[in-house]
């Protein structure tokens, strides 16, 4: 168990826990865990801290619903600090921002947020949005759209139309993300696959 390998004496029983977005790498917040908070975090898969002001365990998002789903917990080389990789549901900060350190503007984070939105639309009323209608039309139609947008992207590049290339590449990425969601895959899996090749 992770609690046993940590140096609790060095931290006076309160382990600093740096919370980082598992996809974008953005630092979201810093909290403190005692042994009980860490054990609850491991047991539930939701980040739980020890609140020094409330003097009790506090699961992030327990009232707002903006929970932090744990991907991994790794101690540093001295076993006196934790790095907690998470997939957040909603904003992390009580001020409504992605990070407690303000909006850092990480561009890759937008793709993750778009992917979350597309996942929500998968089960929405087809009349509510283009995306929901696209899901309702089925895999063949979604795949056809990816093919069409791929060809249009290539054609824009061959005529050196940077404006149109940007627009068509955006359409291609959008439709590709819809197709991945339709097939139960996410962008993280594609990124992992790319990493394994290089």
Swiss-Prot record:
Gene Ontology CC annotation, any one: cytoplasm
A GO molecular function held by the record: phosphoribosyl-ATP diphosphatase activity
GO BP: any one term: L-histidine biosynthetic process
InterPro entries the UniProt entry points to: His_synth_HisIE (IPR023019), HisE (IPR008179), PRib-ATP_PPHydrolase-like (IPR021130), PRib_AMP_CycHydrolase_dom (IPR002496), PRib_AMP_CycHydrolase_sf (IPR038019)
Pathway info: Amino-acid biosynthesis; L-histidine biosynthesis; L-histidine from 5-phospho-alpha-D-ribose 1-diphosphate: step 2/9; Amino-acid biosynthesis; L-histidine biosynthesis; L-histidine from 5-phospho-alpha-D-ribose 1-diphosphate: step 3/9
Primary subcellular site in the record, as a coarse category: cytoplasm
Plastid keyword on record: no
Keyword list, A-Z: Amino-acid biosynthesis, ATP-binding, Cytoplasm, Histidine biosynthesis, Hydrolase, Multifunctional enzyme, Nucleotide-binding
Matching HAMAP family: HisE, HisIE
The family this protein is said to belong to: In the N-terminal section; belongs to the PRA-CH family. In the C-terminal section; belongs to the PRA-PH family.
Protein name: Histidine biosynthesis bifunctional protein HisIE
Native source organism of the sequence: Klebsiella pneumoniae
Gene name for this UniProt entry: hisI
